[in-house]
Amino acid sequence: MKKPFYKVLYVQVIFAIVVGVILGHYYPSLAVDMKPLGDGFIKLIKMVIGPIIFCTVVTGIAGMQDMKKVGRVGGKALLYFEIVSTCALVLGLAATHILRPGVGFNIDPATLNGKEVASYAAKAHGQSSVDFLMHIIPNTMIDAFAQGEILQILLIALLFGSVLAHLGERGRVVTDFIDGITRVLFGIVHIVTKLAPIGAFGAMAFTIGKYGVGSLVPLLKLIGTFYLTSVVFVLVVLGAIARFTGFSIIRFVGYIKEELLIVLGTSSSEAALPQLMEKLEKAGCSRSVVGLVVPTGYLFNLDGTNIYMTMAVLFIAQATNIELTWMQQLTLLAVAMLTSKGASGVTGAGFITLAATLAVVPTIPLSGMVLILGIDRFMSECRALTNIVGNGVATVVVSAWEKELDRAKLRAALSGNGEAAAGEAARV
């Protein structure tokens, strides 16, 4: 029996977002007080992200038997991430050259006050490549889970799963126990997800109430350029990859619409991570691939952030009438490929990575970031949406490369008949 439309989660989330926008516009002081609703929902989701990643990766690797496969899957995922991330960076650069959203501002860099972005610049200079690599190793196992550090948890899970795979039948009891914990954790996610409309309402009301719709007007061209470029990236770049793999990007986006709406309402791609992992398994991707690709993708495959990076730098250059040589732009691409890695989960990640990138192109003033500080919050939704679609597609692609994609389940899921096909398992 079909649910009444008002009981469907994505309908509830859409309604909550609309109400949040209305409240934020007409009653901004009250709307700002709604912030704890959004923050609380995201905290509830983050509460289970670490344990879910640990359990999913451990059970996936423990069932692989062949440990060479773990390295193979990881290698293929990283290769895919680099290729697609580069496409996103180049597309952001090309779109800004074509649409020229910064032309006409004629801003004198000397008049810009960089105090508002000083904290982001300090964070950007504060972490070197060595610091980043050392940060992957936790002080203790407990500390990794307590801090919610995805890379650290992933490292622990890889080691734990590898040992269980080596033990074979002797480790079966532990593997079965962790698998049972996984089911409990996803049950918790189902309960928490029902609160998504409340979280989306609170986050959207706060955003509109604090920043106001009026703050968008002067920079609408940049916002429009970014949103348009992201749509083109999803439909053309990811669409071509999806078609080559044997599925429709439009149907895939429709399949994860609830997760996308949660991301839209909360501006956090992490808010939908557990649900995305579960849906990808239901769509025929193997648990081992989902467990490895999705968490690493949230750190190394930030397509939306990559588009934003090159676009923001070139926008600042155009707005301040600074001409960049092709060599400087190629340097920008190379640096952005490095600075964007591992940015997910860091407060103000977009601005921190942008500051790190600008530091390598000294002709563009760091204070130019002030120009987009006010609208960054409105662009974060698009970044997060593009990131989650990109990671979903990446997981399906790597599963197909590994011949661990159940195409019968995938077709059924994307056509809306996932449950009916649940029993069909024809690995291809």
Curated annotation (Swiss-Prot):
Keywords from the named record: Cell inner membrane, Cell membrane, Membrane, Symport, Transmembrane, Transmembrane helix, Transport
Membrane topology recorded in Swiss-Prot or TrEMBL: Multi-pass membrane protein
Keyword Signal attached: no
GO cellular component: plasma membrane
GO-annotated biological processes: L-aspartate transmembrane transport
Family membership: Belongs to the dicarboxylate/amino acid:cation symporter (DAACS) (TC 2.A.23) family.
Pfam families reported for this sequence: SDF
Record-annotated membrane-spanning stretches: 8-28, 44-64, 78-98, 148-168, 184-204, 222-242, 307-327, 355-375
Predominant location category: membrane
Superkingdom of the source species: Bacteria
Localization terms from the record: Cell inner membrane
One of the record's GO molecular function terms: succinate transmembrane transporter activity
Organism expressing this protein natively: Burkholderia mallei (strain ATCC 23344)
Main function: Responsible for the transport of dicarboxylates such as succinate, fumarate, and malate from the periplasm across the membrane.
Designated name of the protein: C4-dicarboxylate transport protein
Designated gene of the protein: dctA
